[in-house]
């Protein structure tokens, strides 16, 4: 795996292992430095395994359920849900390829697999992370168009598929240079102690081998800009515009609308808080890892600082970043009332007989679409012959307020069944 998504390969080990303190997992000789196969004491290793298993379990279960619910329920085959489905797929890849390999890299010395696995795993890890981030941006764009510009046509299913193809194509393009530069290298001055019988083995690392440090820095900067800085800026700007648009919806209400203002105000607060949660989670989960990667390439750190960063700080930063893939199904799915109804339908959790009024309500809910941050939007019941949605709006009087009610999962007074 490359230096981008794991810790042992994140820096030059020529400057990390030094000293002859036998309390640490390395021992120095005149020309050779020996290190233990396991990098940590058993209790530290147990903490690493437990914490990574927790997010792995949440990631696999949560995102698998999201995929199952979207596939099983035909009424959930909508534009926003396809984006959420794509997000779940990319997050599943993060769980399958990033979490176990990174955990292994955090607790043992060296790369235990071959050269082909080095390139493949590094490429898939980078692609899955990039695709997950780009899909978050696509979801934000979809919600931004619907709430801020409610009179404009919604994205069609065809357009959504094109965007998904572009997302994966862009992710592959961005991460290909990393896969090309990934190589398994033998450490000439380091060996691994396999047992107490003084048996040793050659150490191999899977890491990017750039011609010079300047090229590595340029590529790291490009990744930082395209996978973190630009997506973060777009998400924050669009969600801020959505929040501002929702905040202004009831400024000029009269008559019957005044009776609804208190309820609408509560809905606004709920939506705005959820938007802030999405943005903050994205910022906080990825910022430490990107900070470390930029420091590794640009800062002139001492050997002791490099050792501490690679052995202790990087594992936590990766764990925090991977948490984003574990909480995404909760934020974009299970906080959504309509999604929970779809979950119950898919797994046949509803045991009691549904009353006629409740059946009507369930049919109405099935015209709702999962939205970002647990928000909902009605999918228009009528479409033109080409399959294009006629628009996000439901009311010409106050389309943004109507979008607000729909965004929060409240059924409007529609007569469609």
Swiss-Prot record:
Residue ranges, Cytoplasmic side: 67-82, 141-160, 239-274, 332-417
Subcellular location: Cell membrane
Primary localization class, coarse: membrane
Keywords from the UniProt entry: Cell membrane, Disulfide bond, G-protein coupled receptor, Glycoprotein, Membrane, Receptor, Transducer, Transmembrane, Transmembrane helix
Transmembrane segments: 46-66, 83-103, 120-140, 161-181, 218-238, 275-295, 311-331
Extracellular side of membrane: 1-45, 104-119, 182-217, 296-310
Disulfide bridges in this chain: 118-206
PROSITE patterns assigned to the protein according to its UniProt record, in alphabetical order: G_PROTEIN_RECEP_F1_1 (PS00237), G_PROTEIN_RECEP_F1_2 (PS50262)
Cited InterPro entries: GPCR_Rhodpsn, GPCR_Rhodpsn_7TM, NPFF_rcpt, NPFF_rcpt_2
One BP annotation, GO: neuropeptide signaling pathway
A cellular component term, taken from the record's GO annotations: actin cytoskeleton
Glycosylation sites: 8, 20, 31, 198
Main function: Receptor for NPAF (A-18-F-amide) and NPFF (F-8-F-amide) neuropeptides, also known as morphine-modulating peptides. Can also be activated by a variety of naturally occurring or synthetic FMRF-amide like ligands. This receptor mediates its action by association with G proteins that activate a phosphatidylinositol-calcium second messenger system.
Designated name of the protein: Neuropeptide FF receptor 2
Designated gene of the protein: Npffr2
């Amino acid at each position: 795996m490359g230096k981008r998504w794991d810790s042992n390969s994140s820096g030059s080990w020529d400057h990390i292992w030094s000293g002859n303190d036998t309390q640490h997992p390395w021992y120095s000789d005149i020309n050779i430095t020996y290190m233990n196969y396991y990098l940590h004491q058993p209790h530290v290793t147990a903490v690493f395994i437990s914490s990574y298993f927790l997010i792995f379990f949440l990631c696999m279960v949560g995102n698998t359920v999201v995929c199952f619910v979207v596939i099983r329920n035909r009424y959930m085959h909508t534009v926003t849900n396809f984006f959420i489905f794509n997000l779940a797929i990319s997050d599943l890849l993060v769980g399958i390829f990033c979490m176990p390999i990174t955990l292994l890299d955090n607790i043992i010395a060296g790369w235990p697999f071959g050269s082909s696995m080095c390139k493949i795993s590094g490429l898939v890890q980078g692609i899955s992370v990039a695709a997950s981030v780009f899909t978050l941006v696509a979801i934000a764009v979809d919600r931004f168009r619907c709430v801020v510009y409610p009179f404009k046509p919604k994205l069609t299913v065809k357009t959504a598929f094109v965007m998904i193809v572009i997302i994966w194509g862009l992710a592959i393009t961005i991460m290909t240079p990393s896969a090309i530069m990934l190589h398994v290298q033998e450490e000439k001055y380091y060996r691994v102690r396999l047992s107490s019988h003084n048996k040793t083995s050659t150490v191999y690392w899977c890491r990017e081998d750039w011609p010079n440090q300047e090229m590595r820095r340029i590529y790291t900067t490009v990744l930082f800009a395209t996978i973190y800085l630009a997506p973060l800026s777009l998400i924050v700007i669009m969600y801020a515009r959505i929040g501002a648009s929702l905040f202004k919806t009831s400024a000029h209400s009269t008559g019957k609308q005044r009776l609804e203002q208190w309820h609408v105000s509560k809905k606004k607060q709920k939506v705005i808080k959820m938007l802030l949660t999405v943005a903050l989670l994205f910022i906080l989960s990825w910022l430490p890892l990107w900070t470390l990667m930029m420091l590794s390439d640009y800062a002139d750190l001492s050997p002791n600082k490099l050792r501490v960063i690679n052995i202790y700080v990087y594992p936590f930063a990766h764990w925090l970043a991977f948490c984003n893939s574990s909480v995404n199904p909760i934020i974009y799915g299970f906080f959504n009332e309509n999604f929970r109804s779809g979950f119950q339908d898919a797994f046949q959790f509803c045991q009691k007989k549904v009353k006629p009024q409740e059946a009507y309500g369930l049919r109405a809910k099935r015209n709702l679409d999962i939205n970002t941050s647990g928000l909902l939007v009605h999918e228009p019941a009528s479409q033109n012959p080409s399959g294009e949605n006629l628009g996000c709006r439901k009311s010409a009087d106050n389309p943004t307020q109507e979008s607000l009610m729909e965004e929060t999962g409240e059924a409007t007074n529609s007569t469609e069944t």
